[in-house]
Amino acid sequence: MDLQLKGKTALVTGSTSGIGKAIAASLIAEGAAVIINGRREEKVNETIRELEKETPDARLYPAAFDLGMAEGCGAIFQQYPDVDILVNNLGIFEPAEYFDIPDEEWLRFFEVNIMSGVRLTRRYAKRMIERKEGRVIFIASEAAVMPSQEMAHYSATKTTQLSLSRSLAELTEGTNVTVNTVMPGSTKTEGVETMLESLYPGENLTAAEAERRFMKENRPTSIIQRLIRPEEIAHFVAFLSSPLSSAINGSALRIDGGLVRSII
């Protein structure tokens, strides 16, 4: 299937690793030019080199900006003032006891997970609506609808993304702009793999054994009983970025392996 992304330009925030990097790779494979974003220039350039090895004719542009800060969002817009696709993937997570989370940490999570998307869509989505064409995608989490007691601050930001995305979608009436949210379940990113290694110290479990145990003990409602692979999310995001997905707007879409026990 041709997703008709040739000639399109996408900004994928937080795209030097994990889900963001996989999304960038999927868009590149479909012919889109992609702006690679991370905080460190060295890491951004390294990611571009890796992606170019996979797709030699890839069109990739570096954007080493901290989008968890207003200054970074302003700077990236100044360098790349127009995109066809905006994927708000940037996000942070960290387990923490609710009663021990200080105000500063709540504000940090809000700045990175919410305000980065607010600031970027304020600029890019406005231009998309003016020309009546574009795609905005927020990467949230199943925690948006199934909040976690060990990550209350993270869960709250993910729920907020659903509301923000739907509000923005309402502004696109009469255009070919769409705004949607994708809610992945637990995903096999570098950060999650590191977390699994720390969960069972001294038990000499293989990575596969640790994954199965984690899913059984911590994600018992998952139907697939495994971590989701970043590329599984990325392929779906590529479709949402495509003109072929024009009837999907204002939606919150789960890729969670059946983790959330709901038919809607």
For each of these PLM feature ranges, what is it?
Residues 73, 97-98, 105-110, 218:
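Substrate-binding pocket helix/loop in short-chain dehydrogenase/reductase
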Residues 6, 146, 237-238, 244, ...:
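Short C-terminal tail/terminal secondary-structure segment
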Residues 141:
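Residue(s) in the substrate-gating loop at a strand-loop-helix junction
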Residues 121, 157, 165:
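Active-site helix of classical SDR
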Residues 9, 16-17:
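Conserved glycine-rich cofactor-binding loop
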